[in-house]
Design a protein with these regions (language model features):
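Conserved nucleotide-sugar phosphate-binding/catalytic loop shared by glycosyltransferases and other
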Residues: 1-20
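Conserved nucleotide-sugar donor-interacting segment of glycosyltransferase catalytic cores
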Residues: 22-91
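Structural motif
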Residues: 41-42, 103, 139, 207
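Short, polar loop motifs at secondary-structure junctions
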Residues: 47-51, 109-113, 131, 174-180
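A short helix->loop->beta-strand "cap" motif at the edges of active sites that frequently abuts
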Residues: 59-62, 168, 225
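Nucleotide-activated sugar donor-binding and catalytic core shared by glycosyltransferases
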Residues: 66, 73-82, 86, 94-95, ...
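Donor-nucleotide binding loops and adjacent catalytic segments primarily
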Residues: 118-121, 125-207
């Protein structure tokens, strides 16, 4: 079943981080990890796992938080003060919870981050896995992820109608919860699948249509693809802002966009050499970041210090 589309409510998405990730989910995470910390030298968690950060801090274990939001705009520490204070009190931790850990690993290029929400001073920039080298051709990949795919109304149908009109080879990944057969017969140049090897497919694609998840954003850049984004929730509207502001493609309203508008956007963005140049420049910037092994060496310093103190 696919739920109807609703307009993006940015305030709601921000409040989910505050009420859920820094609230109920953090309480549960802290409770589950606390018993595992004896003898630990370092805790590595994603930037939304405030419970792991709090439990580690309470136990005196250094924390490396890993950014998972490319734009940096979804997680706003100034909105988390009350929730993190409740978490601190519950754990009996004397000092305020540090919502960025001791080190903050960022596997995205600095330009991908919204300048209104800069990385903290303890940031370690890290190159993501490069994936296959781009060999772009007239080929389109479309996906709406594995959560918002079932909250997308008739957006898949509109995308498929647009791809039929464009006429170049395309693959649409609908996710594990949807049967490709529900979308009916498609032209021979359009393939509908539950799963695809995204890295392999993105390295071929000159255009990627997606929902705006941070992972698809960075993987599309590394694949050398222009992007058309249909933001529906979570961090997606902020990712869409970066795609637009960096000139990497177009942002379309998932609620109102027509098949003709989608097709026109595909043909326009693939013909724009300026977009291709910006994508390639950002790809080079991303690949020039410090390697994971370099970052791991930096992470070992606080871990070794903690081990000596035990």
């Amino acid at each position: 079943m696919i739920a109807p589309l609703v307009p993006v409510d940015i305030e709601h998405e921000l409040s989910v981080v505050e009420r859920y990730f820094a609230g109920d989910a953090a309480q549960r995470s802290a409770a589950s990890i606390s018993s595992e910390l004896a003898g630990a030298d370092l805790v590595v968690c994603d930037e939304l796992d405030f419970g792991a950060m709090a439990a580690a801090q309470s136990a005196g274990v250094p924390v490396a938080a890993v950014a998972v939001i490319a734009s940096g705009a979804l997680v706003r520490p100034n909105r988390l003060t009350d929730a993190l204070e409740a978490l601190r009190v519950g754990l009996g931790t004397p000092a305020p919870i540090r919502p960025r850990g001791d080190l903050f690993v960022v596997p995205f290029a600095p330009a991908m981050r919204d300048p209104r929400f800069p990385a903290p001073g303890n940031a370690l920039w890290m190159r993501p896995e490069p994936g296959p080298a781009p060999r772009t051709e007239p080929y389109i990949v479309a996906t709406l992820g594995t959560e918002f795919n079932t909250e997308s109304g008739n957006l898949f149908d509109r995308i498929l109608t647009a791809l039929a009109r464009v006429g170049t080879p395309a693959t649409v990944a609908v996710g594990p919860d949807l049967d490709p057969a529900r979308f009916g017969p498609q032209p021979s140049h359009v393939r509908v699948e539950q799963y695809i090897d995204l890295d392999a497919e993105l390295s071929r694609a000159d255009v990627v249509l997606h929902h705006g998840g941070s992972g698809l954003f960075v993987r599309s850049v590394l694949g050398g693809s222009a992007q058309i984004v249909f933001p529906m929730g979570a961090d997606q509207p902020f990712t869409a802002d970066r795609v637009r502001d960096l000139g990497l493609g177009y942002v379309l309203d998932p609620v109102t966009v027509t098949p003709d508008a989608i097709a026109d956007a595909v043909m326009s963005v693939r013909a724009d050499q300026r977009v291709k140049g910006r994508v390639e420049a950002l790809r080079r910037e991303t690949l020039a970041l410090p390697t994971p092994s370099t970052v791991v060496a930096r992470l070992q310093a606080p871990a070794n210090s903690a081990a000596r103190e035990q």
